[in-house]
């Protein structure tokens, strides 16, 4: 009987929502990241230097935007709205990559959208931590299970990404990623 009571306490709706959203956002991200260099070289026609430059600009912008949004989130404290905003940016980013093949557009608008979108996952983990602290859950276990969801997503996502990209095209792959982010918004 005690086992049933503790199991029911562990499997509440909020807990399940955190796990599902972490998994889905992880899959959507894992669809895009591993195939990016292939997309840039094959679809956009970028030479190796430009692919490397894209990754460099993307990393620097991601760090700067993430730091800025983290400071803003810590001071204002509304992580839910920020996560929703970041997921909306992720949808826009995936659709941009699905239907645009112009390098300058991708390295400007795409990098900006990706930088904003990539902030969603750390904010989700911060919100989960706040939830675990306030609900008397075991914080370490809760965080570990969420990280396991993200790891599982990264086991499933890359092979799925290459299967979709090589068999159905990058437009389909990025559109599916956008769809997964839309579902994560709900």
Features from the language model and the residues they span:
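Symmetry-related core transmembrane helices of the 12-TM Major Facilitator Superfamily/SLC fold
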Residues: 172-186
């Amino acid at each position: 009987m005690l086992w049933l009571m503790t199991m029911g306490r562990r499997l509440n709706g909020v807990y399940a929502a955190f796990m599902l959203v972490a998994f889905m956002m992880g899959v959507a991200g894992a669809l895009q990241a591993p195939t990016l260099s292939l997309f840039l070289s094959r679809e956009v026609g970028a030479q190796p230097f430009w692919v490397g430059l894209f990754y460099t600009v993307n990393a620097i912008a991601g760090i700067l935007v993430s730091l800025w949004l983290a400071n803003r989130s810590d001071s204002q404290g509304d992580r839910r709205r920020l996560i929703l905003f970041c997921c909306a940016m992720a949808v826009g980013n995936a659709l941009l990559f699905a239907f645009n093949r112009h390098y300058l557009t991708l390295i400007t608008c795409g990098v900006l959208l990706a930088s904003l979108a990539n902030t969603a996952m750390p904010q989700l983990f911060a919100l989960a931590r706040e939830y675990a602290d306030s609900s008397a859950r075991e914080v370490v276990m809760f965080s570990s299970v969420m990280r396991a969801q993200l790891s599982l997503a990264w086991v499933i996502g890359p092979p799925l990404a290459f299967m979709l990209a090589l068999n159905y095209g990058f437009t389909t792959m990025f559109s599916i990623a956008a769809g997964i982010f839309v579902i994560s918004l709900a």
